[in-house]
């Protein structure tokens, strides 16, 4: 039997496990020493050096600010003077991404979905205020750490907007907000709108496009045909505004009446809600483990 040796990255990092096989960048769990594990994103060798440096700059820019929302940047191949490889090392989230929890029909109740989407909304507002757009908010880029705190990854797809035209900046922000709408629906239904199991992706795109023209009827018909979740008029309005490109400021999202229950909480009360969310994720893990046995 052939046993492959763990991959080495630069002088510091050894492969523990490769966790994605179908996309670039490749993502590994690595360790620097037995007690320290990290995510390592390995980019193709032919990745344009300027593009790679740009990705690194986004992480370094964010790292200058104390924030609880994103996977912390640790290092990169340029900083370690490694020429033959291009990689970025990030904080390791032990519980993996939300896609492992919200899938196969699993979904969150409305209260829990509000907490997750509130935290993600605060995170998006945080980077928008730093003139950074994320560009790829999705369930696959939202992780849980050891204590079930939400940590967001995927920033290497981001865009720094310091010297970008104001109209263009708005476009980037609208894209993040629209992605938040898709995320919210997936949290509540357990289904990805553009997955083949949900329906025809082109019909969904057309229905979202119709929302921008003021017609949301077809969109909600598709949603209700493929989900048992009962969307309130208040929530429908919020999601429609996200897709209709009527909101470009995250504060409008956070101040929406659908979030009033969360926004009224003080920090101590909010921590209690987070404990409930932690319990919910633990239950999902137990159900998954029982299903495997």
Q: Can you annotate each of these PLM segments?
A:
Residues 83-97:
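Conserved short submotifs of the Hanks-type protein kinase catalytic core
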Residues 98-108:
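AlphaC helix of the protein kinase catalytic domain
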Residues 243-267:
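Terminal C-lobe "cap" of eukaryotic-type protein kinase domains
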Residues 72-86:
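Short beta-strand micro-motifs within the conserved protein kinase catalytic domain, predominantly
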Residues 264-293:
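Regulatory extensions appended to serine/threonine kinase catalytic cores
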Residues 23-54:
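ATP-binding glycine-rich loop module of kinase domains
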Residues 116-117:
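Activation segment signature within eukaryotic-like protein kinase domains
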Residues 128-145:
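Catalytic-loop of the protein kinase fold
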């Amino acid at each position: 039997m052939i046993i492959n040796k763990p991959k080495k990255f630069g002088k510091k990092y050894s492969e523990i496990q490769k966790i994605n096989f179908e996309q670039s960048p490749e993502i590994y769990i690595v360790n620097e020493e037995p007690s320290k594990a990290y995510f390592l994103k390995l980019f193709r060798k032919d990745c344009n050096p300027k593009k790679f440096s740009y990705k690194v700059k986004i992480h370094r820019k964010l790292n200058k600010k104390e924030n609880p929302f994103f996977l912390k940047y640790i290092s990169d191949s340029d900083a370690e003077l490694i020429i033959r490889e291009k990689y970025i090392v990030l904080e390791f989230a032990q519980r993996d991404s939300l896609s492992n929890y919200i899938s196969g029909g699993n979904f969150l109740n409305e209260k829990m979905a509000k907490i997750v989407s509130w935290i993600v909304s605060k995170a998006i507002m945080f980077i928008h205020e730093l003139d950074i757009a994320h560009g790829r908010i999705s369930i696959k880029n939202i992780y849980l750490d050891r204590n079930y705190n939400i940590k967001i990854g995927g920033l290497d797809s981001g865009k720094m907007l310091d010297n970008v035209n104001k109209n263009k900046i708005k476009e980037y922000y609208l894209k993040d907000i629209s992605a938040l709408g898709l995320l919210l629906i997936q949290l509540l239904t357990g289904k990805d709108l553009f997955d083949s199991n949900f329906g025809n992706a082109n019909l969904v795109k057309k229905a979202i496009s119709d929302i921008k023209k003021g017609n949301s009827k077809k969109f909600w018909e598709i949603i209700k045909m493929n989900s048992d979740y009962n969307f309130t008029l208040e929530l429908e309005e919020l999601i429609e505004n996200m897709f209709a490109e009527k909101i470009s400021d995250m504060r409008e999202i956070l101040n929406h009446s659908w979030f009033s229950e969360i926004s009224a909480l003080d920090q101590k009360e909010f921590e209690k809600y987070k404990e409930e969310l932690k319990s919910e994720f633990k239950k999902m893990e137990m159900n998954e483990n029982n299903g495997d046995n």
